[in-house]
Amino acid sequence: MSFIPVAEDSDFPIHNLPYGVFSTRGDPRPRIGVAIGDQILDLSIIKHLFTGPVLSKHQDVFNQPTLNSFMGLGQAAWKEARVFLQNLLSVSQARLRDDTELRKCAFISQASATMHLPATIGDYTDFYSSRQHATNVGIMFRDKENALMPNWLHLPVGYHGRASSVVVSGTPIRRPMGQMKPDDSKPPVYGACKLLDMELEMAFFVGPGNRLGEPIPISKAHEHIFGMVLMNDWSARDIQKWEYVPLGPFLGKSFGTTVSPWVVPMDALMPFAVPNPKQDPRPLPYLCHDEPYTFDINLSVNLKGEGMSQAATICKSNFKYMYWTMLQQLTHHSVNGCNLRPGDLLASGTISGPEPENFGSMLELSWKGTKPIDLGNGQTRKFLLDGDEVIITGYCQGDGYRIGFGQCAGKVLPALLPS
């Protein structure tokens, strides 16, 4: 239990302690903090208290504007920091609890802080690891018998996304312009995307990387995963449909990707590990680990249109539905010798479950625009309208506490039409 008051339904109890980067009006310098209840503990203020065997030599990582340096230190440093912070914030520990002056400087209300991207993202890769999502899309665009492509059950399919347009929660997303072909019998046209979609995803940040040419074996993959965030991989379905052959997504994806600001460490999630769905056929040996696991993370997508007093829940899903694991994704990414670096972002792909209410995109929820999604108050959607705000939340439910991720939110702005 922490000496900082934490509500039972708070995302950020002492069991969590996610890392983020924030600034305040009084101090606009981006710096690293840890969320506890509705407060932020400013690690740049207390960095001198990290006196363990690893962090005593690396206190300066908490004086950086991003988490990259801390991510790169590896598991020993992360575990040392977590144990120290849980002890420091404990109701029984006087060091910070009873130091009135230090507490005054070190704690900031989350409501008064501006959040930033947690890391400088050198590279961003998006996977396609939900079997239900891949099957749904395959049925819509091909047929039931050929829903999954021949490679899908043998490797975690992915593509390289655009790191420069990954933004933190709360950043508006402008409706993209692009080339589309709405009528197969007519030439393509240029204009504003009409089929704008959201995608419910999660992503993880890479910790220590690997040298070019040296793959990461699956037995060591967990050592390279720092923590997880929520993600909305905004998608322009009409632009994507016309452009994606033969090289895959490009402008239909690269206009914006939203992530939540707080990175939940893997040690906070391990109590919620569950067996991974059975993989059949058995993957090749380099993708096999002894006890494949995933995480029981409850996920929701809410949509609030202009004029709506309350957001409508359009999707309830769970990360445990994913087919390919994070360890397999990271291992496969490096198997050809590709070098990963601290702060790289690897995303799950759309998270869809077995029931229609578990579908993680409007493409699926509206079944390619044929079934309007009821928002209540007489409003429906097939795809996103200007002014719509999409809010993704997620948490693991413990006994009397929850490990939450905060919000991953973004509002759609109108396209910038050519003059």
UniProtKB/Swiss-Prot annotation:
RNA-binding as UniProt keyword: no
Annotated positions binding Ca(2+): D126, E199, E201, D233
MF-aspect GO terms: fumarylacetoacetase activity; metal ion binding
Question: What organism, scientifically named, is this protein from?
Answer: Homo sapiens
Which disease does the UniProt record connect it to?
Tyrosinemia 1: An inborn error of metabolism characterized by elevations of tyrosine in the blood and urine, and hepatorenal manifestations. Typical features include hepatic necrosis, renal tubular injury, episodic weakness, self-mutilation, and seizures. Renal tubular dysfunction is associated with phosphate loss and hypophosphataemic rickets. Progressive liver disease can lead to the development of hepatocellular carcinoma. Dietary treatment with restriction of tyrosine and phenylalanine alleviates the rickets, but liver transplantation has so far been the only definite treatment.
Cofactor(s) required for function per UniProt: Ca(2+); Mg(2+)
List every position bearing Phosphotyrosine.
Y395
Record-level GO cellular component terms: cytosol; extracellular exosome
Which InterPro entries does the entry link to? Fumarylacetoacetase, Fumarylacetoacetase-like_C, Fumarylacetoacetase_C_sf, Fumarylacetoacetase_N, Fumarylacetoacetase_N_sf
Residues at the catalytic site: H133
UniProt KW keywords: Acetylation, Calcium, Disease variant, Hydrolase, Lipid metabolism, Magnesium, Metal-binding, Phenylalanine catabolism, Phosphoprotein, Tyrosine catabolism
Could you read off the lineage of the organism from its UniProt record? Eukaryota, Metazoa, Chordata, Craniata, Vertebrata
- Specify the protein name: Fumarylacetoacetase
Subunit text: Homodimer.
